[in-house]
Amino acid sequence: MSINPHPMDLSELPEIITSYLRAHKARDLDAAIECYTIDATVTDEGRTYNGPQEIEAWLSRSASEFTYTIEAIGATKTDDDHLDVLHHLEGNFPGGNVDLHFRFILRDGKIAQLVIEE
């Protein structure tokens, strides 16, 4: 296993991540939740959400709090289960635009952990 991330093409992302990103962008909560393990965690803005109910509430809130566009602009991979997808967001949130890392840890073909940070 390599400990240093290396660049990868977005077309090479695992299907579970592309499915999640598609659902997230479309604001399809049911499809997005299906991508997570039963004990998954999401950390966003320093707060951690545990399990499907908290993650669904977070997704619902984040989808309605601001209007924004989101576009994947790059990806790196440490190993098959540790991936980082860089996104550019523009919208009516404070600052108006930001690049955010979506750092995924996969387990058994699903998302076990997602950390979103600058």
Region spans (language model):
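Short, low-complexity N-terminal intrinsically disordered segments enriched in polar/charged residues
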Residues: 1-30, 34
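A beta-strand edge to alpha-helix "cap/lid" segment located at domain peripheries
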Residues: 2-7, 56-118
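Hydrophobic pocket/interface hotspot
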Residues: 20, 32, 40, 51, ...
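Structured catalytic/translocation cores of nucleotide/phosphate-coupled proteins
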Residues: 20-23, 27, 40, 112, ...
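Flexible interhelical turns and helix-capping residues at alpha-helix boundaries
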Residues: 25, 40, 44, 93-95
